[in-house]
Amino acid sequence: MPVAVMADNAFSFRKLLDQCENQELEAPGGIATPPVYGQLLALYLLQNDMNNARYLWKRIPPAIKSANSELGGIWSVGQRIWQRDFPGIYTTINAHQWSETVQPIMEALRDATRRRAFALVSQAYTSIIADDFAAFVGLPVEEAVKGVLEQGWQADSTTRMVLPRKPAPGALDVSLNRFIPLSEPAPVPPIPNEQQLARLTDYVAFLEN
């Protein structure tokens, strides 16, 4: 039986991850059901545990992968994460109709990615084009700019530049809660120019090394 989706919070997702791992270990012949594989793969992505995600993807039997397209959809999100393609993460998540056991996890992953993008931009940039910033955080330009203005950032309507404010230690997670929408976000803006994207990608790589 597939594991039921639990309440949408970090503790519940951690508990669900443990349950899925146990179900895989206890599965006959070591082969779990597709719903368990789907939840487990999505949860590894939510935890940003790319090593376990890759190992899981490799050990899922090819027949199960080919018969369950959702698994490939989840892994395509993982590939965008691996490539540090922030706009691509939002686009890929929004492009799929997820099952009800996976959808809450993917929504949480989208929100966690948005938080991370806000944090990285605030640390890596002194200024950024508003359209590029909106693409990084997966929000419409107007909503993204309005939100950061309320957090003390600056924006120049003439140059269409956003000027991030360096966050106080520990303050960013709380202040970014307002950017987690209750409904589906509008279509993601165009992918930012290559120089902006390369700069953020390089900065993410620097932080992770």
Swiss-Prot record:
PANTHER family: COP9 SIGNALOSOME COMPLEX SUBUNIT 8
One record GO biological process: COP9 signalosome assembly
Gene Ontology CC: COP9 signalosome; cytoplasm; cytosol; nucleoplasm; nucleus; perinuclear region of cytoplasm
The UniProt record lists the keyword Ligase: no
Protein name: COP9 signalosome complex subunit 8
Gene3D superfamilies, per the entry: 1.25.40.990
Subunit record text: Component of the CSN complex, composed of COPS1/GPS1, COPS2, COPS3, COPS4, COPS5, COPS6, COPS7 (COPS7A or COPS7B), COPS8 and COPS9. In the complex, it probably interacts directly with COPS3, COPS4 and COPS7 (COPS7A or COPS7B).
Organism listed in the record: Rattus norvegicus
Lineage: Eukaryota, Metazoa, Chordata, Craniata, Vertebrata
Keywords: Cytoplasm, Nucleus, Phosphoprotein, Signalosome
Compartment list: Cytoplasm; Nucleus
Sequence positions bearing Phosphoserine: S175
InterPro entries for the chain: COP9_CSN8 (IPR033205), CSN8_PSD8_EIF3K (IPR033464), PCI_dom (IPR000717)
Ranges in coiled-coil conformation: none
Residues covered by the PCI domain: 8-179
Function: Component of the COP9 signalosome complex (CSN), a complex involved in various cellular and developmental processes. The CSN complex is an essential regulator of the ubiquitin (Ubl) conjugation pathway by mediating the deneddylation of the cullin subunits of SCF-type E3 ligase complexes, leading to decrease the Ubl ligase activity of SCF-type complexes such as SCF, CSA or DDB2. The complex is also involved in phosphorylation of p53/TP53, c-jun/JUN, IkappaBalpha/NFKBIA, ITPK1 and IRF8/ICSBP, possibly via its association with CK2 and PKD kinases.
Main location: cytoplasm
Family: Belongs to the CSN8 family.
